[in-house]
């Protein structure tokens, strides 16, 4: 930042013998008398203001007027000052008081506001059994005739928040035009698959509760759905006709865990 010069030094710098010439013994007396009526108020609107007092000075009149001339030269000098960041910071520090700002955000709220991507699809197990809604909250697997295909359930598969690993994608399976989602409930020590009714104003959402979330894994032309909280527990169908869909603990045996998925156009 620019430093303010000492007034005395600056005055002496502009003091010269030329100022004295006005008051030499052989100088014009008229010039001396004119200085007695000098109007200092007409020197401009600078920051330096002088006032003449009628009291007696210890210094000679010559010295006083020399100081006036030097001060006038000093006033006419242009000082350049570059406005820097530190100057602005100093000004703001007098106006504002710094306080720590704490942001309280909820990841759940942000995730709920995020758009949920979903696809509509139909599922058939490897035995080509279709999934149908047999009663309000029971999902069964059975073979359908061509004229019965309208009974087949259409799923709304939502891609939800969760850790993706080993080609496993977290999804939630809801039934289209129904407020029903596949979830699990624990009965004793065994997780059991169920259709759970939800609030359509809240679901689907990005941050679904874990009971709704399954890992979708693609294996060749089929997909599997594994519980996120219960590894090696899969959405399964029985080889027996018209049995409810359940959560099974075995792969490659009597329980069918692989499905063919048909993606529907939006």
UniProtKB/Swiss-Prot annotation:
Proregion residues excised on maturation: 1-113
Main location: cytoplasm
GO cellular component terms listed in the entry, alphabetical order: cytosol; extracellular space; lysosome
Molecular-function annotations in GO: cytokine activity; integrin binding; interleukin-1 receptor binding
Sorted UniProt keywords: Cytokine, Cytoplasm, Inflammatory response, Lysosome, Mitogen, Pyrogen, Secreted
Xref: Pfam families: IL1, IL1_propep
GO biological process: cellular response to lipopolysaccharide; cytokine-mediated signaling pathway; fever generation; immune response; positive regulation of cell division; positive regulation of immature T cell proliferation in thymus; positive regulation of T-helper 1 cell cytokine production; positive regulation of type II interferon production
Other information: IL1B production occurs in 2 steps, each being controlled by different stimuli. First, inflammatory signals, such as LPS, stimulate the synthesis and promote the accumulation of cytosolic stores of pro-IL1B (priming). Then additional signals are required for inflammasome assembly, leading to CASP1 activation, pro-IL1B processing and eventually secretion of the active cytokine. IL1B processing and secretion are temporarily associated.
SMART domains cross-referenced by the UniProt entry: IL1 (SM00125)
Organism for this UniProt entry: Capra hircus (Goat)
Subcellular location: Cytoplasm, Cytosol; Secreted; Lysosome; Secreted, Extracellular exosome
Function field: Potent pro-inflammatory cytokine. Initially discovered as the major endogenous pyrogen, induces prostaglandin synthesis, neutrophil influx and activation, T-cell activation and cytokine production, B-cell activation and antibody production, and fibroblast proliferation and collagen production. Promotes Th17 differentiation of T-cells. Synergizes with IL12/interleukin-12 to induce IFNG synthesis from T-helper 1 (Th1) cells. Plays a role in angiogenesis by inducing VEGF production synergistically with TNF and IL6.
Name by which UniProt lists this protein: Interleukin-1 beta
PROSITE patterns per record: INTERLEUKIN_1 (PS00253)
Lineage per the UniProt record: Eukaryota, Metazoa, Chordata, Craniata, Vertebrata
Site (Important for interaction with integrin): 168, 178, 187, 201
Family, per entry: Belongs to the IL-1 family.
Top-rank lineage group of the source organism: Eukaryota
Subunit structure: Monomer. In its precursor form, weakly interacts with full-length MEFV; the mature cytokine does not interact at all. Interacts with integrins ITGAV:ITGBV and ITGA5:ITGB1; integrin-binding is required for IL1B signaling. Interacts with cargo receptor TMED10; the interaction is direct and is required for the secretion of IL1B mature form. Interacts with HSP90AB1; the interaction facilitates cargo translocation into the ERGIC. Interacts with HSP90B1; the interaction facilitates cargo translocation into the ERGIC.
